[in-house]
Amino acid sequence: MPKITFMGAGSTVFARNVLGDCMCTPALCESEIALYDIDAERLEESHLILSAINRNTNGGRAVLKTYCGAENRREALRGADFVVNAIQVGFYEPCTVIDFEVPKKYGLRQTIADTLGIGGIMRALRTIPVLEDFARDIEEVCPDAWFLNYTNPMAMLSGYMQRYTGVKTVGLCHSVQTCSRDLLTGLGMEDQLEGRRELIAGINHMAWLLKITDKDGRDLYPEIKRRAAEKNAAEKHKDMVRYEYIRRLGYYCTESSEHNAEYNPLFIKSKYPELIEAYNIPLDEYPRRCVNQIKGWKEEKANILQDGKIEHTRSAEYASYIMEAILTGVPYKIGGNVLNTGLIDNLPADACVEVPCLVDHMGINPCHVGRLPVQLAAMNMTNINAQLMTIEAARTRKREDIYRAAMLEPHTAAELSIDDIVKMCDELIEAHGDYMAMYK
């Protein structure tokens, strides 16, 4: 009987999706499932909902156990075959709010702030110390487990685990799975969805759709470029930044336009405020999204707990398919975030890259991609520089390394002076209190 440990099980909606998928999978439906969180109330909510799915969808075959608090973490992990990570250190309040409000005082605006930008840097710096604790426990009580990381900032957290721990780690993101489908649907090319072939590689949230053909092998990019240019010229829509990537760089990118607007110095510029409207960029999008999600979940939770009629159908989420492939040996292809062991020739070896991977009984096996077009590798490098420096800061615990990471972050460096970057970092660290007290 496999054991699956879910770290951050208070993330009820995501835990429901991943673990509900496992209950719908023959190789996993009788698993022992350990639910771990530091929030007792949210943990109990997840346990109630997952227990209902187990009864209604799985005939009660899975064994669910809860573990609350750091003092019970080792037991939650003991003997695990798979560890799913979905923690958020500092929650929406106070930490996400701080990550947006303090930079605003310096004139630095953000959209999502969970992957790059000063918000992404701060999120990594308060999360990596927690992952260090996880890693020590995993190395002792479940050393053969696969660590499936879903927490952002993906490249920084997964890269840290891959470089500095003995834990078998892969980072997983939805954006690879939805990239070409969203592109073709947005351009009215739904007739090309079936049988399409694609190659995606780069870094998390900035991986590139390098090739896309129809079922007969015909290149779809010429028509994509024509339609994307026409749509950007004709109307406001939610994907204008990525369509501009197609125009200027020649390729489409995995993650959404609201994300990519803040990964470079090109779109959110205090000197050119008209660009916000021109590219339909939703500033402060993540806080709005969090508020709506919290409200929506409260309503959904009340309905679920009232009638208990919750069931589940297996989704396209990677996690259960990865576990199934490793346990059964039946191969499955994913886009995974792994250490760049010669996979992308013109990105550094220390980088965490997102490439096609084949999963089977031997584990997660990344595929060699070769060289990216120069302009795409250069765009990736602007992000990788900040990622690597942030990991270094998390290792050294030195504030001067945090300053360096922020100075290398493209959007931050384009908007602020060095002195203001240092002041902003100090103010953020102080505002985060105990979450970042280790940085001296």
Question: What are the roles of these predicted feature ranges?
Answer:
Residues I4-C29:
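N-terminal Rossmann-like dinucleotide-binding module
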Residues R16, W146, Y150-D216:
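Rossmann-fold dinucleotide-binding core
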Residues L64-L77:
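Short acidic low-complexity segments
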Residues C24-G60, R73:
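Glycine-rich phosphate-binding loop and adjoining beta1-alpha1-beta2 segment
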Residues G188-K440:
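Long, compositionally biased stretches enriched for glycine and/or charged residues
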Residues E93-R163:
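Rossmann-fold NAD(P)-binding glycine/threonine-rich loop
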Residues C24-A27, S51-R55, A76, E140, ...:
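Short, surface-exposed basic-aromatic patches at helix termini and helix-loop junctions that form
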Residues A80:
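An anion/phosphate-binding loop that grips the pyrophosphate of nucleotide cofactors and donors
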